[in-house]
Amino acid sequence: MDAPRINKWLKPLSALYGVGVRLRNYLFDKNVLISNSFDIPIVCVGNITIGGTGKTPHVEYLIRLLHPRYRIAVVSRGYKRKTKGMIVATEGSTAWDIGDEPRQIKRKYPDLTVIVDADRSRAIGYLCDLAEEQRPQLIVLDDGFQHRKVKADLNIVLTDYNRILTKDYLLPAGRLREPAGSIQRADMVILTKCPDDLAPIDLRAAKRDLALYPHQKLFFSKFMYGQGLKPLFSDQSPSAEVRSALAIAGIASPKLFFREIRTRFPSGTDRIYPDHHEFTDREVCLLIQDWHELHRKDANAIVVCTEKDAMRLALRQSSFPQEMQERFYYLPVEVKLMFDQEKVFVDRLLGVIQHKK
């Protein structure tokens, strides 16, 4: 567990930001500002930090556990999309239409209802008004912990094992959207990106640092890159002789991705971009140059990006030369709960669904 980097010069601005956040939370706690309740059970999967906890893989994990046993809908803001208002995703929706993360979910689960709307209450109201045979039995509110206008039946908060929440700082000096103590609003907390060799002393330290209430269940999850590479533009699988890769990541915390890539492909070039990055023409040209340079050294070299980046890079297909397209892959990631916690997790989810039947 690492101590977060704090920009001390921005602490005064963080103090002002904190006043506003605390006031807003106080008004919701005292019912001066109203949270809307709905007839359909709602599970919120959110963060207290501005990203990097693996939220989308955890949303997909929840879907895998309950789908197709239950009709599930996902409601998201659709961050960085180029559209406005409420959009019901289709299989043809792009990352520009609905955002890269909702696009990733819809691509994996095409029969799922995925809606993007900055006004999450409006989107949920739309789902509640659907005919009985279409109405979801569970709504997953993606990144909605701060969206307190919606009252979730279960709040799941994710926090990165490698970035200690209680030692972080409010924006803009740190990465906290609200004070670390806000985690006490959560029903369940998942400590994400845990190492395989997590020891009992580490578990006790995590519980102590988070200072959770007795009713708050703490779970531990790890990333799994066990799946093979998936072709982005073609149907060709990579050669077993590949030793070099141009690795591309535009996510909040790319460390685990690059570590996995370099374990599989020891040589190559790493390119890091901001989270949800929209690749410019110049950046695409530089990636093509990187590819040509690497390919001259190793004729079997490939290009690998994260699964989330694949949703955006797919929009630039025509910009890449054909030979590069044929060697362009993405690396899917899944999460798994550790210490045989899955049954407890599922039972809690089922309890929420059954409670509102």
UniProtKB/Swiss-Prot annotation:
Record carries keyword Kinase: yes
Catalyses which reaction(s): a lipid A disaccharide + ATP = a lipid IVA + ADP + H(+)
The keyword Lipid biosynthesis belongs to this UniProt entry's keyword annotation: yes
GO molecular function terms noted in the UniProt entry: ATP binding; tetraacyldisaccharide 4'-kinase activity
Broad class of enzyme this protein falls into: transferase
Keywords: ATP-binding, Kinase, Lipid A biosynthesis, Lipid biosynthesis, Lipid metabolism, Nucleotide-binding, Transferase
GO CC terms: plasma membrane
Gene Ontology BP term (one): lipopolysaccharide core region biosynthetic process
Protein's job: Transfers the gamma-phosphate of ATP to the 4'-position of a tetraacyldisaccharide 1-phosphate intermediate (termed DS-1-P) to form tetraacyldisaccharide 1,4'-bis-phosphate (lipid IVA).
SUPFAM superfamilies named among the record's database cross-references: P-loop containing nucleoside triphosphate hydrolases (SSF52540)
Pathway: Glycolipid biosynthesis; lipid IV(A) biosynthesis; lipid IV(A) from (3R)-3-hydroxytetradecanoyl-[acyl-carrier-protein] and UDP-N-acetyl-alpha-D-glucosamine: step 6/6
Family according to the record: Belongs to the LpxK family.
Binding site for ATP: T49, I50, G51, G52, T53, G54, K55, T56
Protein name per Swiss-Prot or TrEMBL: Tetraacyldisaccharide 4'-kinase
Catalytic activity, EC: 2.7.1.130
